[in-house]
Amino acid sequence: MANEKIRIRLKSYEHSILDESGAKIVDTAKRTGAEISGPVPLPTERTLFTVLRSPHKNKDSREQFEMRTHKRLIDILNPTPKTVDSLMKLDLPSGVDIEIKL
């Protein structure tokens, strides 16, 4: 696996579990002898929902809800087979979406 790169994108609604899982990935990769770049914080995506408070009238009275998606990027340079094995066995929290590109 010489001169290869594994790019891992993490997404979550909570930044605390995102940072925790990013630290686990970096720890695992460093223990197996791979070079690490990251975790790099990517821009937070903010989705805003505006709804009427009342079901029939009072259009001026509205309520707003927002949903934030936090993202991190980790590059693993020159991974060894041991690195790939340990990343496959890694147990991460359920609220984190992981996207891996080789």
Swiss-Prot record:
Involved in the binding of tRNA to the ribosomes. InterPro entries: Ribosomal_uS10, Ribosomal_uS10_CS, Ribosomal_uS10_dom, Ribosomal_uS10_dom_sf. Keywords: Ribonucleoprotein, Ribosomal protein. GO terms for biological process: translation. Belongs to the universal ribosomal protein uS10 family. Part of the 30S ribosomal subunit. It comes from Lactobacillus delbrueckii subsp. bulgaricus (strain ATCC 11842 / DSM 20081 / BCRC 10696 / JCM 1002 / NBRC 13953 / NCIMB 11778 / NCTC 12712 / WDCM 00102 / Lb 14). The gene is rpsJ. GO terms for cellular component: ribonucleoprotein complex; ribosome. NCBIfam families: PRK00596.1, rpsJ_bact. This is Small ribosomal subunit protein uS10. GO terms for molecular function: structural constituent of ribosome; tRNA binding. The keyword Ribonucleoprotein applies. The keyword Nucleotide-binding does not apply. It comes from the Bacteria.
